[in-house]
Amino acid sequence: MATMVARPYVNHVPTLTGGIGKKDLLRFYDEFFIPSNPPSTRMKLLSRTIGSDRVVDEMYFSFKHTQEVPWMLPNVPPTDKEVEIALVSVVCIRGGKLYHEHIYWDQASVLVQIGLLDPKLVPDSFKGKLDRLPVAGAESVRKVMDEDSEPSNDMLDAWWDDENEDAEDADDSADNTDSEDD
């Protein structure tokens, strides 16, 4: 806590977990954050941007959901499922001390991976208009780690329609062009 300003705050944006002030943050870290990370938790720094009063980290974060993780999945019992996500942390520094930290991740991706959100379950009001919810699972962070690991634009039906038309146009133009060597 010595590395924090008098009234710091931390906000895990998707779940509104964290706290305001040293007392709340100490309780949050001691009871809900540090001990709640499963033993399988792995984190890898992917990039860091440093500004005059901010540090922004992009991280790979994974774990097997073998225990409750209150800061990420409040009140959700363990599912024994693997979770892989990208986390972004924005830390604001004032006078060399932590003023606030905002942590972002794709909560829909987490819920898909643990089986709490099924992309195929479209609300009645969207049936006939939408085949699946536009959410991804672990493939989203895998694409961050390796851009060739997953196809881009897989959820865009029109992308594939345009690609087929472009391929047909390319085939047509190839058939109608003369070689300069002729």
Name each model-derived stretch.
Residues M1-D182:
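C-terminal and inter-domain tail/linker signature
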